[in-house]
Swiss-Prot record:
The keyword Phosphoprotein applies. This is Pre-rRNA-processing protein FHL1. Residues 1-90, 139-169, 243-270, 384-442, 718-936 are annotated as: Disordered. It comes from Saccharomyces cerevisiae (strain ATCC 204508 / S288c) (Baker's yeast). Residues 300-357 form the FHA domain. It is found in: Nucleus. Present with 639 molecules/cell in log phase SD medium. Keywords: DNA-binding, Nucleus, Phosphoprotein, Transcription, Transcription regulation. Residues 854-863 have a biased composition (Acidic residues). Residues 139-150, 384-395, 864-911 have a biased composition (Basic and acidic residues). One of its GO terms (cellular component) is nucleolus.
Length: 936
């Protein structure tokens, strides 16, 4: 045997058969229940080999063979009366006269009785149970006979060649589930242990990547894992999908799929052994219907991989369905919670254990969690369950271990001739046949036609709209259930062959028209899409509208044609008419001009209305603000009383100004003009109206709510802040000696009939409104008279810079005034002029004001004349500029200013006029109050 040693472990392998002799060893099952049985048989075709067997005392070995009776009897005697050595081991002694030929015949099998010898009735199922329960640690106690105790004799070359042929034709059968019996040959336990240790060390040093080493590493990793995230190994028989291409699996279910090997050749370690499965390291796996994905990273993206866009990285491609987003979900390991989690990114969500999860939510993943994205379901598998399954079936580990040891022993002894097997027919493995993965055929791109391949009549796009195409297609090919999108596409290609050759893209326009055009409706649902049909009612209504519109268009066209014919007929009659046509043309031109003027007038009227409305709003706002300012001191009156007072005061003011302007024949908005030109006097009118309304509302309890003196002072101060002083020209006047104060007081007391002088300072003077609405008169040159009548006081202060008028002087002018009618008229002129844009009131205040109320009549008259002469030109210019807007005439000087002494008759005339104006104003105020009360 060339000094080699072979140990054959009986599993589910069928031994080689010899054509001449047949030997079978049947071991009683009762002998295997108490202790382990090991047999070691070393065969050599031409040499005598001593056989040592360690058997229990109760073991029975029955040998059946077709040989002479004397040989069988000798062997039976040896078995019945075993010979033991010094250590108590059984020893089989062979006679010296047993030659080589007789020994070889003893080991040959008979092919005729092969099936009878291995009858399944002789081995029961309970016989194999003790063997299956043998611990893995006992497998390492296999002992091998020593090399020195084996007698090796030369081998006959002829027989060696014959044995090689027999070995080459031997069929090795591998089974999925193994029931093995450990048999070994042992001569001496200490010697065998030492030999096993040497052999084991030799095999480890020879190949560190053998299958036993890998299996040991797997077992150690399973125990060391302890629920960590270390990738676990998946065995191929545990998977659902197709095995990888670099793995080789064997189906052990039938005898037809057995593999034949030459026993003389060494087994290549790179090739997988029968029943060996490839190992895949992964954290988890995703089981789909047609494939399996191994999660080998802590983060995996699930989605739809685009054919054209490679920017989106997808680890698990779920197909081209548009219901799946490019990045639909992600599986990641959460170190905080210590588990895998699923986060939904796609807008359509996903189902996790038949529960819908919306976009943006994250759910934990457990073992065997069912997930469905779109129409694709799959299962999440964790390796812990796989480890538990492995621990539940230790017999599988025993079988794998015994098989690996058998392979290693075969490698050491390739020329074994005899194999002793036990047991009945092993069960066939129930492994599923490997299902080849059917790859989806790649999407065939549409053929791009060249211009020569397209027929000439189909090279241009039809002028029909998509809605018309769809209507024609659906009416021609539609059924009662409707048409799907693919059917509509096919129908359009059939009706309009242009779309057979044109590139894709028109389908989106078709879908757009189907969804937005009301002529098409969804009839029924089929699968994921809808079947489309026509809305005949809507189409009929559209047809009626189109027909009506066409009729109207035809009527308009006929009317236009008739009008054109009439114009042509008139043109033909032009020579007959002659001059009449020329006159008519001129009249048409005049009419056109008139129309233009009317249009411009209308535009001006509209602009005037806008300006009037804006002026009214501005005036009312100003009046309201001033009323609020005037009534800050409410003197304990309630809000209701103050509101009534303000309402009546506002009505009185508007009514007084409007009535005065109406009596004078002035049009426009006099209140706005007064506010723009003289706001100080408007404030005085408001103050007087507030006092009158207070006395009326409170029924005399409160006679005066506003002090006119403080009102005038505040108004002048506000005007002085905003106005700029105007330099007046220097006027040379003759020197007039100053009058003593006694004369001034005498002249002031010489007019006891002065209306304004005798009136109380807190009362309202209705006649003050008439000063602003005097009729326009031609300005007269009074410069010479004014130059001769300037008092000495004015000549002394003429070179001084103009200053704002003091509040007390203004009050004296507005309330007390002068003692004559001429002084009152001149005073009204001075006050109206002081409200102009030039701020002349502030400039002339120094000349017109006096230090006491006893100023003489002549002095006051001369001062007023001087002021009127200075401001005459300015007033005339302002009147011209504002005449178109406000229609407010300027206040010209009174003719009586030329005379320093006024007769009593003129004074009485002025008094009568003032009385009449006051009566009219009072009547107007009453009417306004009544109308306001009705409105409120």
């Amino acid at each position: 045997m060339d000094g080699e040693m072979a140990i054959i472990e009986s599993s589910n392998h069928v031994g080689t058969s010899s054509p001449t002799t047949e030997t079978q060893f049947t071991i009683d099952s009762s002998a295997l229940k108490d202790q382990e049985t090991k047999e070691s048989i070393t065969n050599s075709p031409t040499s005598e080999v001593p056989i040592e067997t360690k058997l229990p005392k109760s073991s029975d070995i029955v040998t059946e063979e077709k040989h002479p009776q004397n040989t069988t009897t000798d062997i039976e005697n040896e078995v019945e009366n075993p010979v033991t050595d010094d250590n108590g081991n059984l020893k089989l002694e062979l006679p010296d006269n047993l030659d080589n030929a007789d020994f070889s015949k003893l080991l040959e099998f008979d092919a005729k009785n092969d099936e009878a010898l291995f009858n399944s009735n002789e081995l029961l199922s309970h016989t194999m149970d003790p063997v299956n329960n043998i611990d893995l640690t006992h497998d390492h106690s296999r002992e091998v006979s020593s090399k020195e105790d084996i007698n090796i004799e030369p081998v006959n070359p002829d027989e060696d060649e014959r044995e090689k042929t027999q070995d080459n034709t031997a069929a090795v059968k591998t089974e999925g589930i193994r029931n093995s019996e450990d048999t070994s040959i042992q001569k001496d336990e200490p010697t065998a242990d030492a030999i096993y240790t040497d052999v084991h060390k030799l095999s480890v040093n020879k190949d560190t990547e053998t299958l036993p080493t890998l299996v040991d590493e797997k077992n150690n990793m399973l125990h060391m894992r302890n629920n960590s995230i270390t990738p676990i190994m998946f065995q191929q028989h545990e998977l659902v999908g197709q095995p990888p291409q670099n793995t080789v699996t064997e189906n052990n279910s039938t005898d037809a799929e057995t593999t034949q090997r030459k026993l003389s050749e060494p087994i290549d370690a790179s090739l997988p052994l029968p029943n060996e499965q490839p190992t895949i390291f992964a954290y988890a796996r995703l089981d789909f219907q047609s494939f399996t994905f191994y999660v080998q990273t802590l983060h995996a993206i699930i989605g739809r991989r685009s054919e054209n866009d490679f920017s989106h990285k997808v680890d698990v491609n779920l197909g081209p369905s548009k219901s799946i987003s490019r990045r639909h979900a992600q599986i990641f390991y959460n170190f905080g919670t210590g588990r895998f989690e699923l986060s939904i990114i796609g807008k359509n969500g996903a189902f996790v254990d038949d529960i819908f999860v919306e976009k943006g939510n994250t759910v934990p993943l457990r073992n065997k969690t069912k997930i469905q994205i779109g129409q694709i379901p799959f299962q999440f598998i964790l390796p812990e369950q796989e480890r538990n399954d492995d621990s539940k079936s230790p017999e599988n580990a025993d079988i794998a271990e015994s098989e690996i040891n058998t392979r290693n022993l075969k490698k050491n002894e390739p020329k074994s001739k005899k194999k002793i097997t036990t047991g009945a027919k092993p069960k066939k493995a129930q492994t599923k046949p490997a299902v080849k993965k059917e790859k989806k055929p790649p999407k065939i791109p549409k053929k791009v036609y060249t211009l020569e391949e397209i027929p000439v009549e189909y090279r241009t796009k039809p002028t029909v709209s998509y809605s018309a195409m769809l209507t024609t297609c659906i009416r021609k090919y539609s059924t009662a259930k409707g048409m799907s999108l693919s059917e509509i596409y096919a129908g359009i290609r059939e009706l309009f062959p242009y779309y057979k050759y044109c590139p894709d893209g028109w389908q989106s326009s078709v879908r757009h028209n189907l969804s937005l055009n009301k002529s098409f409706r969804k009839v029924s649902k089929e699968g994921k899409g809808w079947l489309w049909g026509l809305d005949e009612e809507y189409i009929a209504e559209r047809e009626r509208q189109k027909k009506k519109q066409s009729e109207i268009a035809v009527a308009k066209a006929q009317a236009a044609q008739l009008k054109l014919e009439q114009q042509q007929h008139k043109l033909q009659q032009v020579p007959q008419r002659g001059k009449k046509d020329i006159v008519s043309q001129r009249s048409n031109v005049n009419a056109r001009k008139q129309n233009i003027s009317q249009t411009l007038a209308a535009n001006r009227a509209a602009s005037n209305r806008k300006n009037t409305a804006s002026d009214n709003q501005r005036t009312m706002k100003y009046l309201q603000e001033q009323l609020v300012i005037l009534t800050r001191d409410r003197k304990g009156l309630s809000k209701q009383v103050i509101a009534a007072i303000l309402t009546q005061a506002l009505a009185m003011t508007i009514n007084q100004v409007t009535q005065a302007a109406k009596n004078k024949g002035i049009t426009g908005n006099p209140l706005t003009a007064l506010m723009d030109k003289n706001p100080q006097h408007l404030n005085l009118i408001l103050a007087a109206a507030v006092n009158a309304a207070t006395a009326k509302v409170t029924k005399g309890e409160v006679k005066q709510l506003v002090n006119p003196e403080t009102t005038a002072a505040a108004a002048l101060a506000a005007k002085a802040q905003h106005s700029k002083p105007i330099r007046q020209p220097i006027v040379q006047t003759p020197h007039v000696p100053d009058r003593p104060p006694s004369q001034l007081s005498a002249s002031a007391s010489s007019h006891p009939n002065n209306y304004l002088h005798d009136k109380q300072p807190g009362s309202f003077d209705p006649s003050s409104l008439s000063r602003f609405f005097q009729p326009r008169q031609n300005a007269r040159a009074t410069s010479s008279v004014a130059a001769t009548s300037v008092p000495a006081a004015a000549s002394q202060n003429v070179d001084a810079q103009p200053k704002p008028k003091p509040a007390q002087d203004n009050d004296l002018e507005s309330e007390s005034g002068t003692s004559s009618s001429s002084s009152s008229s001149s005073e009204s002129g001075s006050e109206s002029d002081s409200g102009s844009d030039d701020g002349s009131a502030s400039g002339s205040g120094d000349n017109s004001s006096t230090s006491s109320e006893s100023e003489s009549e002549s002095d006051s008259g001369s001062e007023v004349d001087e002021k009127n002469n200075k401001n005459e030109k300015i007033d005339s210019e302002s009147i011209k500029n504002n005449e178109s807007k406000d229609d407010i005439p300027s206040k010209d000087e009174n003719s009586s200013n030329d005379n320093r002494e006024i007769s009593k008759t003129d004074e009485e005339g002025h008094d009568s006029k003032r009385r009449k104006v006051s009566e009219d104003i009072n009547e107007g105020i009453t009417e306004v109050n009544v109308s306001l009360e009705e409105k409120l």
